[in-house]
Amino acid sequence: MKSYFVSPVAYILLFSCSLINGASFVFWLNYLSINNIKEFTLLQACMNAFFFWFLLLVQVPVLTMRSFAEEYKLGTIEMILTAPVREWELVLSKFLGSVCFFSVLWMPMALYLAVLRIVYGHSLGMSAGMIVLPFLMLLLIGMFFISIGLFVSSLTKNQIIAAILSFALIFLIFSLSFLIYLGIGGQTREMISYLSFLDQMDTFSRGIFDSRPVVLLGSATFFFLFLTEKILEWRRLRE
């Protein structure tokens, strides 16, 4: 995680994330209070807004593009792979470092909400579940996207290519969320709804816990980390 804080990209991400989330927070707070809207909470509005998802889709590829691509470019991957470190340990360390920094990026949003909770108390209209569960879903989605970013970064030594391919793959998977609006019904609609990040976030932001997305995202994250480990194992054998 230390490597993130010596990179200017990290501070750009932190600044942009804080700025966009802060602006979104202020906008929705004013909008909901002025129009006296009670149908959804402040956190629901923020976490279902366009800029929330745009920021999430863009920041993860930028966050993970250096993970292995830079090691390939600098030639340090050979030294790492010949060290007494197993591939899964390397993948896990990169993954946990990225997840920790990802959490730091979104921490200001939690702080904004904490301040409002202190000032307004229960009049804010949000239970503990409505506050904790959306951030849990955000973390799960972030972990899944990060695992994709690490996998793509392990395939190339060009950081820009890693970022572009990661974004393309993440966006493709995210686009499945919009299939539900094509008028599909029956079991197909139910399956798409189960795979939809938008529906999952909406459910959790209402304070409703559903174990299915947790299992799905956890399994998908493990799958991409497993693929990354196999890529590194193949590179070790090739050396």
Predicted regions and their residues:
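Transmembrane helix boundary and interhelical loop/hinge segments in multi-pass membrane proteins
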Residues: 61-79, 95
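Membrane-embedded or membrane-proximal helical elements that form or frame transporter/channel pores
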Residues: 30-64
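Short helix-to-coil transition segments within interhelical loops
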Residues: 79-87
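A short amphipathic helical element positioned immediately N-terminal to and/or at the very start
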Residues: 1-4
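Hydrophobic/aromatic residues in alpha-helical transmembrane segments
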Residues: 60-64, 112, 147-148, 227-228
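Secretory targeting signals
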Residues: 22-26, 42-45, 51, 55, ...
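Terminal transmembrane helical anchor/hairpin motif
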Residues: 28-43, 162-231
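Hydrophobic alpha-helical transmembrane segments of multi-pass membrane transport/permease proteins
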Residues: 6-30, 51-60, 168-174
